[in-house]
Amino acid sequence: MSNPSLLILPGDGIGPEVMAEVRKIIGWFGDKRGLNFDVSEDLVGGAAYDVHGVPLADETMAKAQEADAVLLGAVGGPKYDDLDFSVKPERGLLRLRKEMDLFSNLRPAQCFDALADFSSLKKDIVAGLDIMIVRELTSGVYFGEPRGIFEEGNERVGINTQRYTESEIERVARSAFELAMRRSKKLCSMEKANVMESGILWREVVTRVAKDYPEVELSHMYADNGAMQLVRAPKQFDVILTDNLFGDILSDCAAMLTGSLGMLPSASLGAPMANGRPKALYEPVHGSAPDIAGQGKANPIACILSFAMALRYSFDQGAEADRLEAAVEQVLADGVRTADLLGTEGVTPVSTTEMGAAILAKLDASL
């Protein structure tokens, strides 16, 4: 039986630095746990533009379509600001999402106890927080037609169209319910059914899909109230399902409850392939951070936790994902911190590679 395949796309800025630490951890799982991957590496974003003149080569896209999972570092940087929109680094990432049809975006917001003081909210509100936001990623107002800026009478008008089909809602809803079954069997769907027809349809479809998951406790909430509740009492939620626009806003809101974007992974999942695994792209939430690139200051944890998500959702290795996540939590509990997490007494400042080494040491200790 062949090893599962993993395509690595380090990208730009701090991407190569944080990905280097992930490569070491991938190697550890092969050496110590017999969990081997066929790993290949290619270019994306500005790095691809510098070589190929496009932010994602066709050959790389083909590799991504064939891989069991894709792990991406970060894309973009000021060097590419003046490029035509069609070849900006971010277009490489957008092409991956579009052509792989990655419709279900998973954004965890977990607050490690050791970092609760970094949240802008009181410690007792966020300590132990563990939310998963499932955002529909390929439809809705960002993609609906008609769209554009047009002349109408004596002035211009900007138009965007919120559009969802039943099938688009159903597939992301099923993704969220399946996820809820893995977790606490609790799901809150957020929309604006009080003022938007797309929200009415969304609620109807989600309610219908819920009948196939009787073990999951389903609730509905208007998205504006959901944003307020995320700040007021975030631990009332477990899995949150929402559309593209509201998911964009709510996931960023939830992210800041945790204290640092350098900690947050994400997954974008598509339909199952022939082998039963979903097409999948994993990436940290943070950007390319060109201001600290090459200085050893980058926090590799978000990228490492993105690999943990790949272990869980693409490779059915939930126990090994737990092992890796526990190693990260133990390192943080020991007071080991990269530059983005300094600011409290009794911590040990470390570089990117030192953080990776500390996590590897905890993995060794877990055996």
UniProtKB/Swiss-Prot annotation:
Enzyme class, broadest EC rank: oxidoreductase
Signal peptide: none
Segments crossing the lipid bilayer: none
Cofactor note: Binds 1 Mg(2+) or Mn(2+) ion per subunit.
Annotated pathway: Amino-acid biosynthesis; L-leucine biosynthesis; L-leucine from 3-methyl-2-oxobutanoate: step 3/4
Entry binding sites for substrate: R97, R107, R135, D224
Cellular component, GO annotation: cytosol
Intracellular or extracellular location(s): Cytoplasm
Pfam families recorded: Iso_dh
Entry's EC annotation: 1.1.1.85
GO annotation terms (biological process): L-leucine biosynthetic process
UniProt entry keywords in alphabetical sequence: Amino-acid biosynthesis, Branched-chain amino acid biosynthesis, Cytoplasm, Leucine biosynthesis, Magnesium, Manganese, Metal-binding, NAD, Oxidoreductase
Residues that hold Mg(2+) according to the record: D224, D248, D252
GO molecular function, one term: NAD binding
Catalytic activity: (2R,3S)-3-isopropylmalate + NAD(+) = 4-methyl-2-oxopentanoate + CO2 + NADH
Residues carrying the site annotation Important for catalysis: Y142, K192
Residues bound to NAD(+): 77-90, 287-299
UniProt xrefs under InterPro entries: IsoCit/isopropylmalate_DH_CS (IPR019818), IsoPropMal-DH-like_dom (IPR024084), Isopropylmalate_DH (IPR004429)
UniProt cofactor(s): Mg(2+); Mn(2+)
PANTHER family: 3-ISOPROPYLMALATE DEHYDROGENASE
Family: Belongs to the isocitrate and isopropylmalate dehydrogenases family. LeuB type 1 subfamily.
Subunit description: Homodimer.
Function text: Catalyzes the oxidation of 3-carboxy-2-hydroxy-4-methylpentanoate (3-isopropylmalate) to 3-carboxy-4-methyl-2-oxopentanoate. The product decarboxylates to 4-methyl-2 oxopentanoate.
Protein name: 3-isopropylmalate dehydrogenase
Gene, per the UniProt record: leuB
